Amino acid sequence: MSQKTVLITGISRGIGRACALAFAKAGYAVAGCCHTRSDLLDTLSAELTALGTPHLLLQGELQNSAFPTSLIEQTVARFGHLDVLINNAGVSMIRMLTDTDDSQWEHVISSNLSSAFYCSRAAIPYFLKNREREDISPQAPYGVIINVSSVWGCSGASCEVAYSASKAGLNGLTVALAKELAPSNIAVNALACGVIDTDMNRCFSDEERAALAEEIPMGRFATPEETAEALLLLSRMPAYLTGQVIRFDGGFL
């Protein structure tokens, strides 16, 4: 059986970094990208090298189609195939709608939604080519797309209209694309995360973090590492599990 390959966007820190290490320890070749933090890519590369994991880490912009297409092409050229795509890259923004200008709105939508569209579109032809492989069992998908979404895409959040809209759109993309690709044995799901203890949520004060934790039945934020374990588990599900937006929120909703 050939080594499986995962591609993770937003790989330099938080959930993406934890995913890279979890999939590496599970025996995958790892490809990924980040937008600006090449120093963090270097650090991650050293960790993957220490694990003996083949990897390809690139810096680029996912908000138009050129780099996502190149990223997928380079991944397949390096490793021969692609098995799992995790659309994890994204940004948050806390701001009243009336204080949100056009460029801020477009930045959030393109970062959180358009990037997943571009990467998924580029990956699908290579997933279809996996039908020719003999090392994929009949119940296993020819490809897996997992979109890292948010509970705010399900319920909405005050002062986070752009973010909530982008994640709601990502949930819609997940369900619609799953129906489109199911006849081709390609699975598409989303993990709708609650509050994860990453840099994205470091904007909250200690008092705000404590108040938010009190609203979560588990009484705490999730770690990036346990989120990565959930994504790894989801990537290994039979192809029949598709079109689902699975909440990972400690019972928050």
Predicted features by range, described:
Residues A26-D42:
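Conserved glycine-rich Rossmann-like NAD(P)H-binding loop of the short-chain dehydrogenase/reductase
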Residues M96-L97, D101-I109, E208, L212:
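Substrate-binding pocket helix/loop in short-chain dehydrogenase/reductase
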Residues S120, S166:
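Active-site helix of classical SDR
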Residues P125, K179-P183:
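Alpha-helical segment proximal to the catalytic Tyr-Lys
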Residues S150:
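Residue(s) in the substrate-gating loop at a strand-loop-helix junction
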Residues A182-A187, L241-G243:
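Short, small/polar-rich loop/turn modules that mediate ligand/substrate recognition or access, typified
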Residues R220-F248:
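C-terminal substrate-recognition "lid" of short-chain dehydrogenase/reductases
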